[in-house]
C-alpha cells in the first residue's frame, strides 16, 4: 500500500523540535504501517475499501490554536482550541469509489495544544504528535468514541500502534479500570 500524503507542516515549530516531524516520508512510513497493521487484523474495524486499496490519500496539517479554534467553531460549533480534528472523506463518499486510491480525509493538529499536553503528560512532542495523528487516523477509518467503552477501545489501539503495532488486540474494555473523559478528543 502506498500513501499520498499532503503534509502542511507550516507550524508553528520551535528550533528545538525534531526535524523529522516535518518530513513527509516520516509520516508516510508511520501511517502506512498503522493502516496495514489495522487491516491485517480482521477483528479491528476498518473499511474494506481501505484494506483493498493500492493507494490511500490523506492530508495532515500542523497548525496553531487560533486556526484550530476557528475550524472547531465552524465544524463542531465549539469556540475553543482542541488538539486534533479529523475530517473523514469516507463518510461522504458516494457509491463505491475506485479502490486503486481511496481518499481518507484530513487530520488537523494544533501544535500549541500538543506542546501543552506533552508537558502535562510528561512525554516529548514526538510522542504527543504520534498519539494525536493515530487518533485522527482512527477517526478517518470510521472509529468514534460516543461512550466510555468505545473511547477506551480506541485509546488502547492507539497505544498499541505507538508501541509497534505487532499483535494488536483490543482488551475487553470492561476489564480496564480507568476513567476517561469521552469529550477529551
Curated annotation (Swiss-Prot):
Enzyme class: hydrolase
Listed PROSITE patterns: UPF0054
Record carries keyword Isomerase: no
Keyword Mitochondrion carried by entry: no
GO CC terms, sorted: cytoplasm
Cofactors, names only: Zn(2+)
Protein name: Endoribonuclease YbeY
Source organism: Parasynechococcus marenigrum (strain WH8102)
